[in-house]
């Protein structure tokens, strides 16, 4: 063994350049692996940050989401929701939503916004937070309450001095006027799959009773049990 050690030292002396280059190659290789791993982790965190607090566990289903053959025969209604519950695993929540163009009016001020008719706890599913006020209750949706939650930019446009809570505003859609009470204002969101800043939200129960009876949903939003399963669940739905 001692002779082997002596031979190794002699080889090192005779091949210093080769040994140095070999060590340099190993060092560069290890450093590259560390750098790539670090960049990969950083990219993953950046993606998560860009989606905001809403996470990556949300699947939004619209006609364009479905394959062409399925889309021609599917209606986004209660029957389709039941079909999803019964046939697709790893779904935690299913929400039917309807979109509407809306003009909001308070006194002499008005602003255009994206109206969304939602079901109970839809906003909580996205982890949206309130600047003040309350979210819709189950009763609000069932009874079709004339309540409205404003995105931060809409609230600022209509109530530049703040204090929108409890105020009565007018929502105009398809040239029809509806009165709503402001029950909440959302905090400004830094990012995410859905940015509510320029949106307003009303109970879908009101939409289905007063605006469009027995409506087919504009889209369906599903929350999966684990964000790692999102791709698999989406493929199963298609």
Predicted regions and their residues:
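Amphipathic alpha-helical segments that mediate coupling or scaffolding at interfaces
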Residues: 8-11, 26, 46, 50, ...
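Short, solvent-exposed loop/turn elements at beta->coil junctions and helix N-caps
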Residues: 99-104, 135-138, 169-171
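Signature of the 12-TM Major Facilitator Superfamily
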Residues: 19-23, 35, 166
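Alpha-helical transmembrane segments
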Residues: 29-40
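Mid-to-C-terminal secondary-structure elements
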Residues: 121-135, 146-238
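N-terminal Sec/SRP start-transfer signal
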Residues: 1-30
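Hydrophobic, regular-secondary-structure patches
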Residues: 40-114, 121-124, 156-157, 208-209, ...
